[in-house]
Amino acid sequence: MDIRAAEISAILKEQIKNFGQEAEVTEVGQVLSVGDGIARVYGLDKVQAGEMVEFESGVRGMALNLEQDNVGVVIFGVDRDIKEGQTVKRTGAIVDVPVGKGLLGRVVDALGNPIDGKGPIVASERRRVDVKAPGIIPRKSVHEPMATGLKSVDALIPIGRGQRELIIGDRQTGKTAIALDTILNQKPAHEGSDEKAKLYCVYVAVGQKRSTVAQFVKVLEDNGALEYSIVIAATASDPAPMQFLAPFSGCAMGEFFRDNGMHAVIIYDDLSKQAVAYRQMSLLLRRPPGREAYPGDVFYLHSRLLERAAKMGDAAGAGSLTALPVIETQANDVSAYIPTNVISITDGQIFLETDLFYQGVRPAVNVGLSVSRVGSAAQTKAMKKVAGKIKGELAQYREMAAFAQFGSDLDAATQRLLNRGSRLTELLKQPQFSPLKMEEQVAVIYAGVNGYLDPIPVNRVRAFEDGLLATLRGKHADLLEAIRASKDLSDESAAKLKGVVEAFAKSFG
């Protein structure tokens, strides 16, 4: 038998070298039961609320219910591979997602994993999904406009940077279309070099069909808008915990821009589905149900999410995060639980109606029920000057239109009011994917409120608008530029605009 001394000494040296090293300790628990996307785990005594845990199969979960003898874990993935008796280990980290400019142009799931097949995400940092909203001191009141490119919104229900404006309506009333047009309207700013004008877009799709999300992404891509957008998708086929988490993940990604002195808008489409997913999780975790079987903290779920949208003061970098949550109502019932909750949290709502949609008023905004509680402070002076009248005139028109159904013989003043109102309603219609710049909206609305549309038949209003815009873009680009640069309609610009509109109105027909 050949004994090699060198070999033995090498083995001994190796053993001596490793002597006294601590074994790696991970805290583990055991699965007691699993089903419906919920696992009950025994033994994770020191686990934190909201901590990520990992199952043997590699699937991750989040500890939500910390009870005396077990932990209720919601599973971010399929629970088919998880069996009773398997071990579960703590990760020691609260749920976080990658954030940064590297996510722009990408489609990710609720945990920030790419689902668009374009390779791994290059993130600058990771952030917790559920953090406290900024306090009162670092904030500043909303004062800059967030242009949507839609006449009916920018003129009547203006939105400011840092505001939370709810888009509410039944299914198929064009809620997502408003959000999509808002994203497309940011393209000119991103083509320019002014960093402050740029608005990054985050779109969170919750509980939607995959085909719908794919179509949305394709429209963004075709219009060159995906490069400044992030899409977070938790589709209908994803587990409820993913649908619950997606808005928080999107918010963390949006907060990166807010906290670094940039501006972002986040669209939650839609929060009704997030509430349903949260209700499902809560009931399976045996939390006591409340009104409409939602858990008692469903208000807190939405308030803590929407409070994170803010306009920061100069000391905090002057960034902003604007939120456009979407809520789907059933048969125009705004008094249901979730709609009333979100209406009370947000700074105003854009109310869309099925009847208007089918009458051909698109976007189908009900101007009477829609409000913006803080947006008027952010409206540009030029828009304020022309849009001030339109609100009053439309309100009178609605009142008179209801009244005129009863009487046939109307006096001239009432008839004039009805004519003006029907033309202004026609003027506020706008086809999809054609957002207008602020200065173009000002010119068009100026023509409407100053009576230049009154002699024109209602069905020719659209042609008048197109013609006027073509004239302005072609021969009077300097006038549009003056309004855009000053954000005001000076006496000189107003006189010039009056001349252009008058001349065009004479030649039109």
Curated annotation (Swiss-Prot):
EC number: 7.1.2.2
Organism of provenance: Methylobacterium nodulans (strain LMG 21967 / CNCM I-2342 / ORS 2060)
Localization (cell): Cell inner membrane
Binding site for ATP: G169, D170, R171, Q172, T173, G174, K175, T176
Cellular component terms (Gene Ontology): plasma membrane; proton-transporting ATP synthase complex
Top-rank taxon: Bacteria
Main localization (coarse): membrane
A molecular function GO annotation: ATP binding
UniProt cross-references to CDD domains, sorted A to Z: ATP-synt_F1_alpha_C, ATP-synt_F1_alpha_N, F1-ATPase_alpha_CD
Protein name as catalogued: ATP synthase subunit alpha
Assembly mode: F-type ATPases have 2 components, CF(1) - the catalytic core - and CF(0) - the membrane proton channel. CF(1) has five subunits: alpha(3), beta(3), gamma(1), delta(1), epsilon(1). CF(0) has three main subunits: a(1), b(2) and c(9-12). The alpha and beta chains form an alternating ring which encloses part of the gamma chain. CF(1) is attached to CF(0) by a central stalk formed by the gamma and epsilon chains, while a peripheral stalk is formed by the delta and b chains.
